[in-house]
Regions:
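A short, basic N-terminal segment
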Residues: 1-107, 269-287
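Pre-Walker A (pre-P-loop) alpha-helix and adjacent loop at the N terminus of AAA/AAA+ ATPase modules
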Residues: 91-133
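Short glycine-rich substrate-engagement loop in P-loop NTPases that contacts/grips substrate
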Residues: 111-120, 128, 151-191, 203-210
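Walker A/P-loop nucleotide-binding motif
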Residues: 127-147
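Hydrophobic/aromatic beta-strand patches that form the interior of the parallel beta-sheet core
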Residues: 133, 162, 195, 227, ...
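Loop/turn-to-beta-strand initiation segments
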Residues: 159-160, 190-193, 222-228
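Walker B catalytic acidic pair
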Residues: 198-199
């Protein structure tokens, strides 16, 4: 801050004669400069003219203006982040029902959900160490819900996640040229976490097995984590029927820690509740 000499003060007073003040500004009698009524900070300063004698008095921002600008930028960043998360969810959760697979909707009946929460809490370490999960067990035991909760929680943290399945992938690949297929499979590497739901439901044709291998191998080489859900038994994964399956399963077992889902069939329980609700509706009497 330049010392306000008598010479400089005369220049300040001369400049102040024609200045227009905002409603929240005043000219301080001590230094003759424009100040903020709210915080008392300077909104004008004194700067020497470079290369020649003299001074000029440019505007500057006070503390409350600085805080307001920081709040504006923070609000803009929050808005951009929300829009980015929305786009990520649209891209990463291609089936609308997956939006409901959240920890908030967990009924607390599956003790394995604590592992899903732990995975999210330790995501940075899991990503760094390329730690994936293999969720295996009977139909309806909560594997997809478990994976979906992880997907939604990480997406809410602005982490790129894709949850899909091989029938969808194979359908997209159908009709593509070889170069386009390679580019499509490589696009999965844009996601920090890739979730393949229901491994084993796809047809085991030579073409399908080849494309499945390309997807898993690409992920394996990218050293990014993946979560696989399947109704297959662990013994089936460890003892594949042929080389084509072995190449896929070996890579999954190396990168994904197995978690057994052997509880009750939640899907059947939900179906029972749905049937009862439908029965109540159709049998209700109207006045």
């Amino acid at each position: 801050m330049i010392e306000i000499t008598a010479e400089i003060r005369a220049l300040i007073d001369k400049a102040a004669a024609g200045v227009e003040l905002a409603g929240d500004e005043y000219i301080d009698s001590a230094d003759g400069l424009i100040h903020c009524k709210k915080c008392g900070g300077q909104r004008q300063t004194v700067v020497p003219c470079f290369g020649k004698l003299g001074y000029f008095m440019p505007r500057c921002i006070c503390q409350c203006q600085q805080e307001a600008e920081e709040q504006r930028k923070a609000a803009e960043e929050r808005q951009r982040r929300m829009e980015r998360i929305k786009r990520r969810k649209t891209q990463g959760l291609q089936d609308r029902y997956l939006y409901d697979y959240t920890f908030a909707n967990d009924n607390g009946q599956n003790p394995l959900m604590d592992k899903a929460r732990a995975y999210v809490e330790n995501w940075k370490e899991a990503y760094k160490n390329n730690t994936g999960l293999l969720l295996f067990g009977d139909v309806g035991t909560g594997k997809s819900f478990f994976a979906g909760c992880i997907a939604n929680a990480l997406l809410d943290q602005d982490v790129p996640v894709l949850m899909t399945n091989f029938p969808t992938i194979l359908n997209r690949l159908t009709g593509m040229f070889s170069e386009d297929r390679s580019e499509f499979i490589a696009s999965f590497d844009e996601y920090d976490l890739l979730i393949i739901d229901d491994l084993g439901v796809e047809r085991s044709t030579e073409y399908a097995m080849e494309q499945m291998f390309f997807v898993i191998d690409s992920r394996y080489r990218s050293r990014r984590p993946m979560i696989i859900t399947t109704n297959l038994k662990l013994s089936e994964l460890k003892n594949p029927p042929d080389l084509a399956h072995a190449r896929i399963y070996d890579r999954i077992l190396e990168r994904c820690a197995p978690i057994l889902f052997d509880g009750k069939n939640f899907r059947e329980e939900n179906a029972g509740a749905t049937r009862q609700a439908a029965k109540d509706i159709v049998s209700s009497k109207h006045d």
